[in-house]
Amino acid sequence: MLQLILHHPYASLAAGILLYFFCLATYRLYLSPVAGFPGPRLAALTRFYEYYYDGVKGGQFVWKVKDLHQKYGRLSCSTVVGQELKLEQGPIVRIGPCELHVNDPTFVSTLYPATGQRRNKDPFWTDQFGPKTAFGTVDHDHHRLRRGPFNRFFSKANVTRLEPMLRQQANKLCEKLEKYAGTGRVIDLSDPFGCMATDIISTYALGYSFNFLDAEDFQPNLLQGLNGFTPLAPTVKQFPWLLKLLRALPDSWALKINPKIAPFLDFQRTMKKVITDVEAEVQSEAGRPKADQATTIFHEVLRGDIPPEEKETARLWQEGEAIIGAGTFLQTPQEAV
């Protein structure tokens, strides 16, 4: 057998691959820093355990984690009730090769301390959002640099100043909804609220509104385009290089793969153009009084004292995509209105 491996390159390659996976499995099961925590062995061996429940069974991993706590959570002795010990479920289970799940709200302040601790992100979680965005930045200090220009725009005081615009958009939404009164038509409220959220955050971030509220029947809208990508999310999380491939594909090819993403592709094209327009505005405002200068998130980023590579167009349009996408797609803005 040894002679066969030494004299046949394919046999050597196969043996090397088998040895690699054997060593990897041994490390993950017995030598990893998290090897001592309870959990299914398959989850300890591969991240495809998570992918099976999220990608194949459709977003079920969060419920599987709950089951894992019930099955593998360590039991600990608590107080004596009469003659019996009260047993409590332990809060920590292993859900991946290098990942633990802690079912304890008090641990949040330890994991995300307010000050004094550096916390780098796991690329497995961030790569799916694109490495050029603040949200997708792994290094703690680099993330802080990218996040810095946005901080004041999301302070309580600055958000309070948005009230006139919020009222205007809310009145616009109500006027459109009143047109449907008595018609018997059914409106999925996620569409108008999604349109309103997109128009608000795009105006605040860019000084440009996508005017989705003006669309007939609130369609097409960005929320529909983002929903078209949702089924791909677990796969992109496992294989982040797919995100680069999807971005590189011609729009016509991408639409053949998934026609539902058409609104998102339109949004992406517009985002690139708007960022270019904002760059031109900032370059042309030299010498103008500060009171006459536009004050939006991306105008301030381009004026800010940050390295030139952080102001590149390719990075900024991805940042804009992330901010507006989050403001539209996340349930919080829609549920708030």
Curated annotation (Swiss-Prot):
Give the EC class as a word.
Answer: oxidoreductase
Q: Which InterPro entries match?
A: Cyt_P450 (IPR001128), Cyt_P450_sf (IPR036396), Cytochrome_P450_monoxygenase (IPR050121)
GO MF terms on file? heme binding; iron ion binding; monooxygenase activity; oxidoreductase activity, acting on paired donors, with incorporation or reduction of molecular oxygen
TM stretches of this protein: 4-24
List all disulphide bridges recorded for this chain: none
**Annotated GO biological process:** terpenoid biosynthetic process
Tell me the domain of life.
Eukaryota
Q: Glycans attached where?
A: N158
Give the EC number(s) listed in the UniProt record: 1.-.-.-
In terms of Gene3D superfamilies, this protein maps to: Cytochrome P450 (1.10.630.10)
Task: State the pathway, as annotated in the record.
Answer: Secondary metabolite biosynthesis; terpenoid biosynthesis
**Where does this polypeptide localize?**
Membrane
* Role according to the record: Cytochrome P450 monooxygenase; part of the gene cluster that mediates the biosynthesis of diterpenoid pyrones. The first step of the pathway is the synthesis of the alpha-pyrone moiety by the polyketide synthase dpmpA via condensation of one acetyl-CoA starter unit with 3 malonyl-CoA units and 2 methylations. The alpha-pyrone is then combined with geranylgeranyl pyrophosphate (GGPP) formed by the GGPP synthase dpmpD through the action of the prenyltransferase dpmpC to yield a linear alpha-pyrone diterpenoid.
PANTHER family reported in the protein's UniProt record: CYTOCHROME P450, N-ACETYLTRYPTOPHAN 6-HYDROXYLASE IVOC-RELATED
Similarity comment: family membership: Belongs to the cytochrome P450 family.
Q: What is this protein called?
A: Cytochrome P450 monooxygenase dpmpJ
